[in-house]
Regions:
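Sec-exported extracytoplasmic/periplasmic mature domains
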Residues: 23, 30-33, 98-99, 108, ...
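Short, well-ordered beta-strand elements
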Residues: 90-93, 169-178
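Short Gly/Thr-rich strand-loop-strand
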Residues: 22, 42, 112-161, 202-207
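N-terminal "mature-domain start" segment
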Residues: 1-81, 207
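Short, solvent-exposed coil/turn segments at beta-strand boundaries
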Residues: 140-142, 165-171
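A short acidic-to-branched-hydrophobic micro-motif
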Residues: 69-108
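Surface-exposed amphipathic alpha-helical segments
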Residues: 175-207
Length: 207
């Protein structure tokens, strides 16, 4: 299966197929099976803008070619200790765009650029964006990029390791949030590759 044929196949994917692409809780790594689903379902441009950086608008996302998305996020239960090195959160997200070129543009001009441009700024909830470090993800079918994002607040440091990867006009996102200053690239790549496999199986009609 070539990247061109995958690209072409994603044009027949409708919004309703996205819900079958995000990983279910049993498909997340073993360390997250005791976590709970804290957010899941559709993620339209309005919702994404509300949860994004200050000043971000749904119109900006529409102009970037984003149609909609679906996500599932796991978080800690109340009895979990938020100690240093604890992976408290994990998520898989699938975004639908109008073209593969728009996916590429989003990865570089919105995902990477927005984080890197806002280092040192407040990111809400009393947190400051301390650093955004590019990582080198491997093992994906097409283009992929990754960041380790470090935030600081009154409760200390929180790290997010995020990978974005392209499957035609779809963008897959996997991320893990960790207490303290820690990188989780290997685990995020594992999560992302499971998501990629699921996305491709749905695109090709076997999901």
């Amino acid at each position: 299966m070539t990247s061109f044929s995958i690209d072409r196949a994603t044009y027949s994917v409708g919004e309703s197929a996205l819900v079958d692409m995000v990983l279910g809780k049993p498909e997340f790594p073993e360390q997250f099976q005791g976590h709970q689903v804290i957010r899941e379902g559709p993620l339209d441009n309005d919702a994404l803008a509300e949860n994004g950086f200050e000043g971000t608008t749904a119109e900006r996302f529409r102009l970037a070619g984003r149609v909609t998305g679906v996500m599932r996020e796991l978080g800690p239960t109340s009895n979990m200790a938020m100690s240093d090195g604890f992976d408290f959160m994990a998520a898989s997200v699938v975004h639908l765009f109008d073209s593969p070129d728009s996916v590429h543009g989003w990865m570089h001009d919105i995902f990477l650029k927005d984080f890197e441009d806002r280092v040192g700024e407040s990111v809400g909830q009393g947190h400051q964006l301390v650093s955004a470090t590019r990582l080198e993800p491997q093992g994906f079918f097409d283009e992929s990029v990754a960041l380790k994002v470090l935030q600081g607040g009154v409760d200390g440091l929180i790290s997010s390791t995020v990978v974005d990867f392209r499957v035609g006009r779809l963008l897959g996102v996997a991320f893990i949030g960790t207490v303290g200053d820690h990188e989780r690239l290997d685990q995020v790549m594992q999560l992302g590759q499971a998501l990629e496999k699921r996305m491709v199986s749905v695109v090709l009609g076997s999901g």
